[in-house]
């Protein structure tokens, strides 16, 4: 029996907190070529480790995370305050399906395949031209992968919008013209 939209929107069915190893975080940010011009969003940010590394090691202009769990939000916010990074890092308590992602230049994901499937239309509608989307371990079905990196902790998939969601047959047609 297929789950309804509302059942799929339940956070527990979309992801569980499984902290991404720091070497994978670094790999994700390197693959996305994050730099001082970037605004990085992490959907389901957990303890905000991607946000901290984006700002501290890659000098991202800003990093924003969405997290549904109150305890993780509180812990992350305390650490942001402790490190005096409130002007560059923010964690929003809420469902990432309701997130305003239009300012993101990089979006990181470590979500179940079902979550990627549910999130795909939102990404297609709301991301700006050239946004880099990085998914850890689970590809976004039907999207064209710009680059894949296999590392000891899993596989990273890089997509660049809007090219990622153009079908290969439409690309073939454009090349023939």
Give the positions of each predicted feature.
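S-adenosyl-L-methionine
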Residues: 1-38, 74-103
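Conserved short alpha-helix immediately C-terminal to the canonical SAM/SAH-binding motif I
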Residues: 69-72
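Conserved SAM-binding motif I beta-strand of class I
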Residues: 62-67
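Conserved SAM-binding loop of SAM-dependent methyltransferases across substrates and taxa
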Residues: 49-60
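Conserved class I S-adenosyl-L-methionine
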Residues: 37-46
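C-terminal substrate-binding/active-site "lid" region of AdoMet-derived donor-dependent transferases
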Residues: 114-177
């Amino acid at each position: 029996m297929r789950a309804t939209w509302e059942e799929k929107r339940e956070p527990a069915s979309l992801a569980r907190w499984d902290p991404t190893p720091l070497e994978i975080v670094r790999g994700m940010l390197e693959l996305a070529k994050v730099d001082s011009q970037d605004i990085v969003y992490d959907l389901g940010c957990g303890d905000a480790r991607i946000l901290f590394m984006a700002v501290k090691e890659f000098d991202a202009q800003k990093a924003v995370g969405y997290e549904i769990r109150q305890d993780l939000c509180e812990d992350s916010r305390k650490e942001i305050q402790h490190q005096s990074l409130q002007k560059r890092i923010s964690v929003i308590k809420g469902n990432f399906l309701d997130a305003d992602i239009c300012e993101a230049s990089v979006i990181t994901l470590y979500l179940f395949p079902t979550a990627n499937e549910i999130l795909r239309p939102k990404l297609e509608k709301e991301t700006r031209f050239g946004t880099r989307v990085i998914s850890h371990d689970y590809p976004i079905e039907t999207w064209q992968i710009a680059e894949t990196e296999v590392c000891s902790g899993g596989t990273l998939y890089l997509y660049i919008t809007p090219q990622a969601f153009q079908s290969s047959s439409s690309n073939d047609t454009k090349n023939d013209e």
